[in-house]
Structure formats: C-alpha cells, structure tokens
Amino acid sequence: MGKPRGIRTARKHVNHRREQRWADKDYKKAHMGTRWKANPFGGASHAKGIVLEKVGVEAKQPNSAIRKCVRVQLIKNGKKVTAFVPRDGCLNHIEENDEVLVAGFGRKGHAVGDIPGVRFKVVKVANVSLLALYKEKKERPRS
C-alpha cells in the first residue's frame, strides 16, 4: 500500500505528517517539554550558583589528566551540577561559597571532549569574568 492519492486525501496527509514529525529528534526535543523538566537550568542559558567544593575529574582514555571542576548548587532550584573551570590556574580564583555564573558547555546538554559527565562551565566568579581574572585585567572584589 502506497500513500493515499486523490482529491480528498488532504486530511490523511496532514495527520500522517503530524504523526511522523515525532520521529524527528529535534522536533521531539523542542515539543516534549523536557527542556524544563530535565535541564537543571530550566531552559535558561545561564544560572547562578554557590560553589560547594572543588573536584578533579579524570579525563577519559586515551588521555591522562585531572580536569579541574567545581560542584555548584544552583540558587534558582537547589539542583547540584558539576561545572568545568576553563584555562590554566583559574581554579585558584575560585573559593568555596563563592557565587559563580555557570553556562552550558557547547554540545547542547552533552558532555564535551574527554570530561565525562560535565555539561557546564564557569563563566563568572563573584560577578567578575573569569577571563578578566585570568588575564589580570580585573581583580576579585574584596569581601
């Protein structure tokens, strides 16, 4: 049996197309509402959080390294996430109980590269850009 052809088959075509859209990965992701349910950020691009601890995450094979990360508890909903701290020595600018701004890590909710289970990265510390601290253009505010 092929597809229905003829002058009064529009409803059948429309309904079939509506059903088949759900097989498309991107359509399903956009329309099922999992963006708000499953994503710790609740659909937002960034989120603020409090640093709980500094952690080292071992890189996946064949690489051998300890990637510097922090455990962050998000302010908006209390969820805990692991966020990567980019650049050499930037972990020294972050202390426990600091407020950090966390963003996605580039692969639309997936882990990046050889860092298993880490889907976020730190962008700001105490409302100062981590890049500015790294380049020594700005200093941490005195508390």
Curated annotation (Swiss-Prot):
- The annotated region (Disordered) lies at 1-21
Report TM segments.
none
CC terms in the record's Gene Ontology section: cytosolic small ribosomal subunit; rough endoplasmic reticulum
Q: Which GO terms describe its molecular function?
A: structural constituent of ribosome
Which domain of life does the UniProt lineage start with?
A: Eukaryota
UniProt KW keywords: Cytoplasm, Endoplasmic reticulum, Hydroxylation, Ribonucleoprotein, Ribosomal protein
Q: Which InterPro entries match?
A: NA-bd_OB-fold, Ribosomal_uS12, Ribosomal_uS12_euk/arc
Listed Basic residues bias regions: 1-19
Q: Where in the cell is it found?
A: Cytoplasm, Cytosol; Cytoplasm; Rough endoplasmic reticulum
PTM Hydroxyproline: list the residues.
P62
* GO biological process entries: cytoplasmic translation
Family the entry assigns:
Belongs to the universal ribosomal protein uS12 family.
Q: Provide the assembly information.
A: Component of the 40S small ribosomal subunit.
Q: What is this protein called?
A: Small ribosomal subunit protein uS12
What organism does the record attribute this protein to?
Answer: Papilio dardanus (African swallowtail butterfly)
